[in-house]
């Protein structure tokens, strides 16, 4: 299984050269001495004049505090997620002992903003939830059962309801988010250890336009709880237009003095919408739009557990590895893909489109650097095929996990053990890592800690 992983990682690296650019809080234990020099050698947070090493981490981690993850059976929260990422041994959602072979240098927890804070209330049987809607009662029952199939069925129904905008009104009340977000940012601050392990703050804004076209963005903040805690994450209940997200980010920066960036992901499940050459409302792109998109979205996630969005055999027919981890059957809610859609779904093609649009608009809306994350919904950021803890709690290691379905279109065995991002930062701190992401001094791998660097100008 490991042998097949080498070609795609090389392919991703070569593509970079073309770019030219809520549970009770537990006490924080001391980090054990890490065997891996990648995470342990830098004990000094002082910044050199220029980056001298790549720091590896994950910008896309969901815990049991995300509604879909919790429904599927994930019980691990941000505490366990950060501990696992920095190299600690933790107990998985299925009760097994889990540990990374090599610790990460940094990680961002990106629980969904939609429904944030609701799972604990539904599980507890809060009367403001239970009894107000039949589906909430079904969710409560699923959260209490050990029936994996039932939990997965209810989880998939919740995803479909989010896609179709038919979630119960009680789940859309922002008051549930207040406590969950407060705990999230405080936990990140406690685990943040500059120079050793950077615990970064973020969330996922989960737009599924037109009945399931994946236009999700992960929002990554440069800051700590003192600034992040002054606001609440944006939800798709408020707006589904990316320009609305960019407005939220601008307001966040103006209010707090902090910094924010967004990372789109899974263009492969967008049914042609990720890199379409119009605005969200189908009106023509303008120079102002292209400039704003480049300003707020410096990176694009090219690989993760739901397949790769780097390229496609139909777009790169001479690339024998373009069919690696291919998820091209339809969108997130299994609406089938139509001919021509793949042209505006993949990163490599978008780089060419962006250069062409630069000539007509005077700005490049698709000036994306390379990002990779796992999109794990277990709290366990594992991107190794021989230490793969699954995309969902229901498909953690077990004798029959490969027989289980993932969703309406894919089986669990089709999920990919991927990926991590290397960041050429001046130091292992939130600020230095974020600044490097903004500069696009990054590269994506399917999990290997290879080091790739390109100089141009």
Model-derived features: positions:
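Extended, charged catalytic domains and RNA/DNA-binding interfaces, predominantly
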Residues: 22, 27-457
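Bacterial N-terminal signal peptides
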Residues: 9-18
